[in-house]
Amino acid sequence: MQLMPLLPHVWTFGDLKLDLSQPHVMGILNVTPDSFSDGGRHNQKEDAVARALEMMAEGATVIDIGGESTRPGAAVVEVEEEIRRVVPVVEELAKHKVILSIDTSQPEVIRAAVRAGAHIWNDVRALTRPNALQTAAELNIPVIIMHMRGEPTTMNNLDQYEDVTVDVIRELSQRVQDALDVGVKAENIMIDPGFGFAKNAQQNLKLLQEFYKLTEMGYPILSALSRKRFIGAVLDGAEPQERAVGSATAHLLSIQQGACMVRAHDVKVTADAIKVWQAMQMV
């Protein structure tokens, strides 16, 4: 099966371009002390910048910087602290030719990050925070709208679906419409089905199996499967750092069904897998 987003287009950031008709790797850069698989490894600006540059060399075309953990049960971080963690890293990386995404739900954080040189807003809460929709419209930057129910502290109790794929598409479509209604441009929207957020293992597998149905929404799709717990369960309880190959396999399955970007901790193995898949398409 070969599907790509129904509305492929190019995002342009000055002299940087992101062609969404081709699959890309978004490298994960957590500047948090408590992320589920790499918390505390990149707390210092120098370590974070070094890791970002390493991921670029490994094949990442976007670096996604997060200052708040959204693992199950994670506590909310104060806005000032999130800005303190994120902005210095953005300022330093902005000196390099790299597209920067900010993993935040706080309008104040994305505004500060954009002033520092960030390009994309990746919001796991789908612009539900106060003033988030208006901020997305005003900033006029690409925004990734993800499906989640509740908060990280409550989402594991909100995984009741009649049909997980149908329900995710319906709920995600409503959030996209809410964004359009306040003036967010359709060409600035990317969607993310939210693997691991308010979904159990079987629901995640079904959503991956039916990933192609998300293309019916007509927007570019981000697939964020890296080191997810359900992949560890499939791999007989593998620890997060042992899930690189399983994650890359799942990401390839989503690319085959229409994903144009995958969000990964293990950039090189993911980028290499995509290269092999792309070579196969050329035969």
Task: List the model feature ranges, each with a label.
Residues Q2-L6, G14, L20, S37-E46, ...:
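Active-site-adjacent loop and "lid" segments of alpha/beta metabolic enzymes
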Residues W11:
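Charged catalytic and DNA/RNA-contacting regions of genome-maintenance
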Residues L20-G27, E54-I65:
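N-terminal glycine-rich anion-binding loops that anchor highly charged ligand groups
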Residues N30:
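N-terminal substrate-binding region of glycoside hydrolase catalytic domains
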Residues P33:
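Catalytic-pocket segment enriched in acidic/His residues
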Residues K185-N188:
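Short acidic capping loops at alpha-helix termini that bridge into adjacent secondary structure
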